[in-house]
């Protein structure tokens, strides 16, 4: 009895709760990083053309871009014995587990269900890839909200999101490293099977352990009636499942895109310049990262993904995939190192110099990847892009914090600004309140004057207490919908959306470009070209007050 009481107190300790929540963060990033590395070659092996393979990779980001605001609002309104966040975390985690089961066993399941296995195998594989990308990326939103609920004190919040960012980086390193191992010759091969089955079996085991940790997380009880709807959520009438109310809710969902368009069109020029620069930079980097392993396997090692297993061409391709995974692992490791020293770099050289240097570094690394046939040079170039990756995680959000801290200077035509705050929720909130200088944002980024540890940006921030000014209540009449002032969380959400949009564009066009050029080197050439475009827009970013007159903002 005493031991059980001691264990219960230990699990309820603040640091124990912090570790339990961030274990799932680690598990999610391991699965996503391994999926980015291994899924494109797997799609090519089963016969998916380059053009359609890249489109498949865009399914998850597109769905995430639309659904994250809805999920954030629904989580804020949820009432249940397991809290507001964990039911959504568990539901999305089940989607990740289902994808980890489907991807390596698509052919086997297709053979059980239908005589002509190829069409069904492709459908199951695409379903698994879409589930992994969608559920994995969207699950970060309720995880961040849970951290914010549990650690509401400012000092504790900064510590919580620092650990959150570190666990994401650590998970990325492991996720990129696992596909680089030849599991066919490992001691696990007799028990787990082929390379794919071993890899995804380990991912499933890691994710199950991390998911089980959330069972011991103690969420705060949410008392009282549901708070007024904020963001995008279904009103109380729809909870009765009345068909007319449900239909009204779905019809009113069509107001989402006009509202988003209105908010984006009203974006201040300083933020618009920053958004365009970040979007171009992310497009260049994601084009490089998404297709790097396929480039190494086909272009550098001269392998053939559709060759029969055991042949020389297939063996070369598999070796290239493992070497490509090692390059992405080094990219993540270098980005982690630069994230740790980013504060010192900014203090010594300034934000402008560090940001421009990081953007200029990328096309140089991508060009070296295109021109060189040396495995060492190509791998070193991939590692060098970690500097760009780190800077894009931190500096744009530092600049956004600067803009909002000095609104009268940087945002003089801030229409509808109601003072920059909407008040904090009386109940637990989904995200941190407005960031302070040197404080970590809820997505792991840092405010001005500090640097954080690498954390991939989430898709969009859902309903929160941090000055979100997009109030569209589904189910209310149009005249009841109002938009108050813009807050920093909305503008951070728009900046964060650049990350998902940067995955959608390459997914739509890169496959066709490669088919027309008949060379996977087109991946790296396109990345280098986008990097050059990003340099131009990076030079147009407003870094200080002197730039306002220089660019006539």
From Swiss-Prot:
Q: Does the record's keyword annotation contain Transmembrane?
A: yes
The catalytic activity, as recorded, is:
sucrose(out) + H(+)(out) = sucrose(in) + H(+)(in)
Write down the Gene3D superfamilies for this protein, in alphabetical order: MFS general substrate transporter like domains
Task: Give the record's keywords alphabetically.
Answer: Membrane, Symport, Transmembrane, Transmembrane helix, Transport
**GO MF annotations for this entry?**
sucrose:proton symporter activity
Tissue specificity annotation = Expressed in the epididymis. Primarily expressed in the prostate, but also in other tissues.
Q: Which SUPFAM superfamilies match?
A: MFS general substrate transporter (SSF103473)
Name the family. Answer: Belongs to the glycoside-pentoside-hexuronide (GPH) cation symporter transporter (TC 2.A.2) family.
The name this protein carries in UniProt is Solute carrier family 45 member 3
In its UniProt entry, the species of origin is given as Mus musculus (Mouse)
Q: What is the lineage of its organism?
A: Eukaryota, Metazoa, Chordata, Craniata, Vertebrata
The coding gene here is: Slc45a3
């Amino acid at each position: 009895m005493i031991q059980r009481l001691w264990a219960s107190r230990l699990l309820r300790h603040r640091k124990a709760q912090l570790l339990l929540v961030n274990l799932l963060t680690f598990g999610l990033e391991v699965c996503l990083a391994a999926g980015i590395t291994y899924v494109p070659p797997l799609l090519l092996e089963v016969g998916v053309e380059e053009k359609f393979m890249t489109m498949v990779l865009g399914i998850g980001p597109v769905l995430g871009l639309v659904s994250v605001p809805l999920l954030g609002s629904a989580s804020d309104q949820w009432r249940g014995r397991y809290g507001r966040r964990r039911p959504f975390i568990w539901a999305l985690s089940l989607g990740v587990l289902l994808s980890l089961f489907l991807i390596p066993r698509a052919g086997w399941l297709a053979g059980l269900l239908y005589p002509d296995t190829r069409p069904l195998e492709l459908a199951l594989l695409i379903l698994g890839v879409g589930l992994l990308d969608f559920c994995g990326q969207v699950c970060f939103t309720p995880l961040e909200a849970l951290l914010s609920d549990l650690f509401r004190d400012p000092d504790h919040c900064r510590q919580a999101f620092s650990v959150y960012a570190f666990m994401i980086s650590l998970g990325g390193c492991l996720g990129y490293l696992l596909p680089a191992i030849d599991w066919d010759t490992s001691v696990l091969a007799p028990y787990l099977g082929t390379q794919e089955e071993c890899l995804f079996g380990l991912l499933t085991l890691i994710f199950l352990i991390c998911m089980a940790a959330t069972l011991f997380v103690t969420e705060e009880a949410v008392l009282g009636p549901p708070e007024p709807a904020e963001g995008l959520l279904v009103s109380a009438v729809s909870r009765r499942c009345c068909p007319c109310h449900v239909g009204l809710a779905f019809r009113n969902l069509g107001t989402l895109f006009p509202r988003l368009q209105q908010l984006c069109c009203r974006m201040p020029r300083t933020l618009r310049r920053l958004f365009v620069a970040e979007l171009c930079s992310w497009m260049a980097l994601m084009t490089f990262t998404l297709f790097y392993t396929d480039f190494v396997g086909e272009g550098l090692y001269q392998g053939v993904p559709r060759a029969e297993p055991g042949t020389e061409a297939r063996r070369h391709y598999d070796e290239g995939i493992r070497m490509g995974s090692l390059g992405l692992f080094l990219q993540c490791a270098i980005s982690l190192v630069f994230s740790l020293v980013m504060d010192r770099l900014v203090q010594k050289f300034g934000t402008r110099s560090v940001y421009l240097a990081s953007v200029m570094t990328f096309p140089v690394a991508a060009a070296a990847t295109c021109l060189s046939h040396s495995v060492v040079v190509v791998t070193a170039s991939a590692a060098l892009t970690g500097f760009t990756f780190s800077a894009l995680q931190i500096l744009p959000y530092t600049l956004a914090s600067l803009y909002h801290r000095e609104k009268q200077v940087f945002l003089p035509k801030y229409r509808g600004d109601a003072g920059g705050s909407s008040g904090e929720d009386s109940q637990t909130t989904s995200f941190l309140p407005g960031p302070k200088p040197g404080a970590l944002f809820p997505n792991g980024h840092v405010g001005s004057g500090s640097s954080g540890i690498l954390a991939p940006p989430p898709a969009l921030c859902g309903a929160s207490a941090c000055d979100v000014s997009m109030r569209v209540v589904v189910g209310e009449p149009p005249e009841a919908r109002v938009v108050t002032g813009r807050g920093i969380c909305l503008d951070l959400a728009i900046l964060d959306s650049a990350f998902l949009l940067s995955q959608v564009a390459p997914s739509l066009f890169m496959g066709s470009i490669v088919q027309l050029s008949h060379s996977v080197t087109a991946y790296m050439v396109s990345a280098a070209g986008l990097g050059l475009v990003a340099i131009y827009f990076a030079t147009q970013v407003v870094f200080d007050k002197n730039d306002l007159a220089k660019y006539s903002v």
